[in-house]
């Protein structure tokens, strides 16, 4: 399973997605009357959902029923929730909403890789990708509109950061994919095609940590989507102080976008390295692996010709892992140039 997941991650990084002009259209300034806006149920944890149901005068068990309709059956229309009374369904419609991102464009490649361009209520857009592998596959989801990291090799890095995604917007991406592949009600782990999630789309997950944690806890909840935590990988460009916290709060797999064997090279291609040096990242990874439920770490390494791809660089990487005694895998990624990338 891990080998197939690892290959899916590698394959994901070789695809060029939508042009910058298509992804970011800058409509976040649209005015929305927050006083009349309905509560988005996919923004709520199970406890928060229960509290809202109690507020409208219903019993707490109704929250469990609603949770299963949303996350086990994938229903967005309250009228389809057949075990709820008509009066309750009307009450839910007046107070709440269950929203999916709007599909603006989609593309399926010859190898069945499926790409979506999704739009949220304020007009902002993100990318999502499904990468199939035999009888399973990984869905790559985004956590921010744009990205503040500015990695020189990254297409998203050429866009300005606009905002964090909400909990519902993060979850909504995966639910769009499940709509597309008919995976409602939630299938078992053995037969699901959307078997893995990789949190390595647009944005830096650790800079939207609270929303990402909440979204992943909902996605892995046993009474809903019920995706195993071992089938979720969160990738970071190296926000060292938050690595241990992120892993402790989610229990998912860790991937680190390393891309260089030393600080000199990494700072050239990843500005974040001037703030969090390789040594600090490695120490955080080592601290994480001291934990009882730690897993192998994947280090993502994009091969840039003449910059980080020599035999000496490979030896440096080996010595780096030995120094910090890390249990890790390297994901070697061929670079797929995009217009204006400079490589």
Task: Give the role of each language-model region.
Residues 132-183:
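Canonical Radical SAM [4Fe-4S] cluster-binding loop centered on the CxxxCxxC motif
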Residues 31-137:
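Flexible, acidic/Gly-rich N-terminal and inter-domain linker regions that tether
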Residues 180-189, 193-343:
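Conserved AdoMet/S-adenosylmethionine-binding subsite of the radical SAM
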Residues 5-6, 15, 24, 33:
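Intrinsic-disorder-associated, low-complexity terminal segments enriched in Asp/Asn/His/Tyr and depleted
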């Amino acid at each position: 399973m891990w080998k197939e997941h690892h290959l899916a991650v590698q394959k994901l990084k070789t695809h060029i997605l939508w042009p910058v002009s298509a992804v970011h259209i800058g409509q976040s300034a649209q005015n929305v009357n927050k006083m009349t806006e309905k509560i988005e149920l996919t923004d709520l944890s199970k406890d928060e959902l229960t509290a809202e149901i109690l507020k409208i005068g219903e019993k707490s068990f109704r929250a469990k029923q609603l949770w299963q309709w949303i996350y086990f059956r994938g229903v967005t229309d309250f009228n389809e929730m057949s075990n709820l009374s008509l009066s309750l369904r009307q009450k839910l419609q007046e107070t709440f909403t269950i929203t999916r991102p709007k599909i603006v464009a989609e593309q399926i490649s010859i190898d069945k890789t499926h790409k979506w361009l999704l739009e949220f209520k304020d007009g902002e857009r993100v990318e999502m990708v499904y990468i199939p592998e035999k009888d399973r596959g990984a869905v790559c989801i985004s956590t921010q509109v744009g990205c503040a990291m500015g990695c020189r090799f990254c297409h998203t890095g050429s866009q300005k950061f606009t905002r964090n995604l909400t909990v519902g917007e993060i979850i909504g991406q995966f639910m769009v994919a499940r709509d597309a592949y008919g995976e409602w009600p939630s299938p078992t782990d053995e037969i699901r095609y959307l078997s893995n999630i990789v949190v390595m789309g647009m944005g830096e997950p650790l800079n939207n940590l609270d929303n990402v944690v909440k979204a992943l806890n909902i996605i892995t909840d046993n009474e809903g989507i019920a995706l195993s935590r071992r089938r979720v990988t969160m990738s970071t460009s190296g926000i060292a102080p938050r690595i241990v916290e992120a892993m402790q709060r989610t229990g998912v797999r860790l991937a680190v976008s390393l891309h260089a064997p030393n600080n000199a090279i990494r700072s050239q291609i990843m500005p974040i390295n001037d703030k969090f040096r390789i040594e600090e990242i490695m120490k955080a990874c080592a601290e994480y692996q001291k934990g009882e439920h730690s897993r192998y770490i994947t280090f993502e390494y994009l091969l840039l010709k003449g910059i980080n791809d020599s035999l000496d660089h490979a030896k440096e990487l080996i010595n780096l892992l030995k120094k910090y005694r890390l249990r890790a895998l390297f994901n070697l990624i061929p670079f797929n140039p995009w217009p204006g990338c400079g490589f």
